[in-house]
Design a protein with these regions (language model features):
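Bacterial N-terminal signal peptides that target proteins for export
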Residues: 2-11
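Sec-dependent N-terminal signal peptides
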Residues: 13-16
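Solvent-exposed, well-ordered loop and adjacent helix/strand elements within mature globular domains
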Residues: 23-364
């Protein structure tokens, strides 16, 4: 009997096995101490997740599998315990498992919690991001007037130094050049593809940030009483700034945040977790609150009004992504991703999937 108890972990018909084996097996969430779950998280059933039965969770499993290729580490976040997430990586179902099997696996291994904000509300803001393709140059030209830099190789400090000073003093290693507006967009998105004059493509991924606050470009235009044709959508703002280069330099340099990049031999988009991002299955979240690698179920709407109910994985972060119910959905690369991502701004609910912990007790 004892050996059977040891090998039983968790399957959909666990209760039947427990009865047969005579085991006393108690189930606990988080790390066995529910008092460590913040009070703004409330346990719910999977039936409470809108559209849960309709989502093809196999794609979310693949995103989680990518997460498992990196070591999930605790870096000061509130929840959950990184070791518990990493343990689930040793229990993944087959990559060929059908939807029902994968759904049952998530239901057996994770407990959903609905997230509430500080005021007790259960909705938050969802935006989108993508990996742009921009024109670039190996040397400075009239068209390519702004450097794209990697972190300083001489160990020079860049933390707490504003963008304007970093660029003017060249605190970093110049990788390539591009239009200043495109470089700002690249920094906001966190990664992108550079198309050089000879047609070759270079992949640039996030390397580091100067830890300065982000100041909205569109917000600055509003403060100045400047309204681009088409309003304050990202597309309208970027177009207006390209038509007004002096203004562009003023407002872009007035945003002190600066992002460094590195050239990647792979064309995959790499998030802060260090693993490739998956289109509409990877999400950027506040890693001061959530351990990267956490499965999260999002219920919101896309910019065209369609319902968006998806199981995703927190694999990235963003300078403006702060708070309990705040996330940035990764929509992929290229023009189509751009159209969806730049129009995305909706309210919705968030459910996080906390790893279950099973405590085994010898049979009496």
């Amino acid at each position: 009997m004892l050996n059977l108890c040891k090998i039983i972990k968790f399957v959909g018909f666990l209760a039947l096995f427990v009865a047969m084996a005579g085991c006393d097996l108690s189930v606990k969430t988080y790390d066995g101490d529910n008092s460590k779950v913040p009070s703004n998280l409330r346990a719910v059933s999977y039936s409470s997740l809108p559209g849960w039965r309709d989502d093809d969770v196999r794609y979310a499993l693949q995103a989680f599998r990518n997460t498992c290729k990196a070591k999930i580490q605790y870096k000061g976040s509130v929840i959950p315990d990184a070791n518990l997430l990493q343990e689930k990586c040793n229990m993944l179902p087959s990559s060929t498992a059908d939807i029902a099997t994968v759904r049952a696996w998530f239901e057996s291994h994770f407990q959903p919690y609905q997230v509430y904000n500080e005021k007790g509300g259960k909705t938050g803001t969802y935006t989108g991001y993508y990996s742009p393709v921009i024109d670039g140059c190996k040397k400075q030209t009239a068209k390519c007037n702004e450097p794209i830099m990697g972190v300083p190789i001489n160990g020079a400090n860049y933390k707490g130094i504003a963008k304007k000073d970093i660029v003017n003093k060249k605190i970093g290693r110049i990788l390539y050049w591009a239009n200043i507006v495109d470089v700002q967009n690249l920094q906001i998105q966190g990664s992108g593809m550079l198309k050089l004059e000879d047609g070759s493509l270079v992949k640039l991924n996030f390397a580091a940030v100067n830890d300065m606050p982000f100041k909205s470009i569109g917000g600055q235009l509003q403060e100045r009483g400047i309204k681009p044709a088409g309003g304050y959508s990202a597309d309208a703002v970027w177009t207006h700034l390209k038509q007004n280069p002096k203004l562009a330099k003023e407002v872009i340099y007035n945003n002190p945040r600066y992002v460094y990049f590195y050239e990647s031999p792979q064309h995959s988009v790499i998030g802060k977790l260090g693993t490739p991002l998956s289109k509409i299955r990877s999400v950027a979240m506040d890693d001061s609150l959530y351990t990267l690698g956490l499965p999260v179920y999002i219920s919101t709407n896309l910019s065209d009004g369609r319902a968006f109910n998806r199981l995703m994985v927190a694999q990235d972060t963003g300078g403006a992504i702060k708070g309990w119910i705040r996330a940035d959905i990764f929509f992929g690369s290229g023009d189509e991703a751009y159209k969806v991502a730049h129009g995305q701004h909706s309210q919705g609910q968030m459910f996080i999937l906390m790893p279950k912990v099973y405590t085994y007790v010898k049979p009496r």
